[in-house]
């Protein structure tokens, strides 16, 4: 089972395409949608929804996959549920870069402060990151340096921020899920 968490643009047609591509790894791909506008509510909703979905699966190694803001959540929700995560062009600092886009971006800072201290150290090797060299939204070199001590980092020379095509990375994602 793969949980797919969309980015800030929840209605992008690319989400369906990414889910379809992930079905080459596992036919059971589930969209876990969230509002993107209310971080504290989103966290509660995602925790409940993932726990509920896991009760209805016999997959011994479910995987979280998130793009952009979805990767922010995939890392945290995956950690709190003991799941591996794939973070694609993760938005690591929505409290800074979501100003003016959502109602309460400061809630992300509050969530970070209330999260398990040093959770990345406790989550080492439980996530893999895929970064676009040509990401038009974030400085992925800087973000990769924040995560490289904890997670493996892969680079893509073609895809933009929304990462329309996962095909080149599906074998690595599958190997990571099954390892």
UniProtKB/Swiss-Prot annotation:
InterPro entries found in the cross-reference section: AB_hydrolase_fold, UPF0227, UPF0227/Esterase_YqiA
Ranges annotated as spanning the membrane: none
Pfam families (UniProt xref): UPF0227
HAMAP family named in the record: UPF0227 (MF_01047)
Similarity field: Belongs to the UPF0227 family.
Protein name: UPF0227 protein Shew185_2404
Source species: Shewanella baltica (strain OS185)
């Amino acid at each position: 089972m793969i949980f797919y968490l969309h980015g800030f643009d929840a209605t992008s047609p690319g989400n369906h395409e990414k889910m379809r591509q992930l079905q080459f790894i596992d036919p059971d791909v589930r969209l876990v949608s969230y509002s993107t506008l209310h971080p504290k509510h989103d966290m509660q909703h995602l925790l409940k929804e993932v726990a509920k979905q896991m009760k209805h699966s016999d997959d011994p190694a479910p995987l979280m996959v998130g793009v952009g803001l979805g990767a922010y959540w995939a890392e945290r929700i995956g950690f709190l549920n003991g799941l591996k995560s794939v973070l694609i062009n993760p938005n690591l600092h929505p409290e800074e870069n979501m100003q003016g886009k959502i109602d309460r971006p400061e809630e992300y800072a509050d969530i970070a402060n209330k999260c398990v201290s040093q959770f990345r150290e406790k989550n080492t090797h439980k996530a893999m990151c895929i970064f676009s060299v040509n990401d038009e939204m974030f400085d992925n070199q800087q973000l990769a340096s924040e995560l490289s001590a904890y997670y493996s980092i892969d680079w893509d020379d073609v895809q933009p921020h929304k990462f329309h095509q996962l095909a080149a990375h599906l074998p690595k994602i599958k190997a990571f899920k099954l390892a």
